[in-house]
Design a protein with these regions (language model features):
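Hydrophobic alpha-helical membrane segments of integral membrane proteins
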Residues: 8, 12, 32-37
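Alpha-helical transmembrane segments of secretory-pathway, organelle, and plasma-membrane proteins
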Residues: 1, 18-21, 34-247
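Long, hydrophobic/aromatic-enriched structural stretches that serve as scaffold segments
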Residues: 1-26
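Long, mid-chain structured domain cores
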Residues: 24, 29-34
């Protein structure tokens, strides 16, 4: 079980507030400075108690032995992975805006005061709004999965699967969840993120006048889709990184 630290909690807080913040700045004429201040307050309200009460996990301890420490310390890997996540958010949001799907969806189920800023959106303006979310996605999804990979010689010996004696849960796990620890961690982190993001975004959207549940759920689902795509990319990144792991 992963130990949640101030880094994980801060990244999760940023990601769960990102959809609502983007909605406010793009469709409700809330300034980016005001939205950024709100996120900072939320991050600090969770991060400070976590920092005081919980120790750092191995991924954030420079002297802790990790098989993939070189990937966590690689500036190139960290920057490119952040840009990858940012790019996914930009493509999803830009595609939704330019196809008319996102605007039509929000207009139908939200009481949107103006679409002017939405029509003025460009990929660059979206990058500015979601770049921090891209960095947070890398920190919450990719880095813990890198850190979860056990050192050589420390893996728990796998028990051979015997269909004749296996229980139903063991059979289901073998057929549908037979992944290494890195992939399991990535799936776990993605599930946690999407659950918190979906529930939190729906709840916050419902505080806006004129919002219907279907609209709030649909908008949150768009971000869940983006996070799932990012996780799939990071799964591939982790697989390709296996060729360069240090033993």
């Amino acid at each position: 079980m992963l130990t949640r630290t101030v880094y994980d909690v801060s990244a999760l807080t940023v990601l769960t507030y990102a959809p609502f913040t983007y909605l406010l700045t793009t469709f409700y004429e809330i300034s980016s400075l005001t939205a950024a201040a709100n996120i900072c307050i939320e991050v600090l309200s969770f991060a400070i108690p976590t920092f005081l009460l919980r120790p750092r996990n191995a991924a954030h301890k420079a002297n802790a032995p990790l098989r993939n420490r070189f990937l966590l310390n690689s500036t190139q890997v960290q920057i490119s992975s952040s840009l990858l996540a940012t790019g996914v958010y930009v493509v999803i949001l830009w595609g939704g805006l330019k196809s008319g799907f996102l605007n039509l969806f929000l207009v139908q189920f939200f009481d949107i005061p103006t679409l002017e800023d939405a029509h003025l959106e460009t990929p660059v303006s979206i990058v500015i709004k979601v770049f921090v979310a891209g960095v947070a996605a890398k920190a919450f999804l990719l880095n813990p999965s890198f850190a979860a990979q056990p050192l050589s010689g420390q893996q728990t010996p796998a028990v051979d699967f015997d269909p004749a004696t296996a229980t139903l849960p063991q059979t289901v796990e073998h057929n549908f969840y037979n992944f290494d620890k890195r992939t399991r961690t990535l799936i776990q982190q993605t599930t946690i993120l999407n659950a918190f993001l979906f529930v939190g975004t729906v709840q916050r959207c419902m505080t806006l006048n004129g919002t219907e549940f279907l609209g709030a759920a649909g908008y949150a689902g768009l971000w869940v889709l983006a996070n799932s795509i990012i996780a799939l990319w990071y799964g591939w990144v982790g697989d390709t990184s296996a060729d360069y792991q240090l033993d």
